[in-house]
Amino acid sequence: MMNAKAAELGCTNTHFNNCNGLPDPNHVVSARDMALISREAIKNSMFRKIVGTVRYEIPPTNKHADPTPLNNHHQMISAYKGRQNLYEYCVGGKTGWTSDAGNTLVTFAEKMV
């Protein structure tokens, strides 16, 4: 299903072998294809809200008495790790890291001119 959708979006150098993005010899996505996928994803209002959230707190549960804070580590939208990389037009993004790929980043910005 993911491979069919990627092809529908115009991706030509992508093959998903799992749904979690973790390393697999047959799991590949080019930067161009990731841009195509991301351009489609940002059109979804829930996705846009999630990737643009700076901080979220999971309420207490029967397993955890205190709230659990989740901080966005994307330095262009969140000052969690300092303010030097904040970008006023950034509306969201997704950071990532695996031992095979190293650091990864997709970022969305809008500037009305």
Indicate residue ranges for each PLM-predicted region.
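Penicillin-recognizing serine hydrolase domain
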Residues: M1-V113
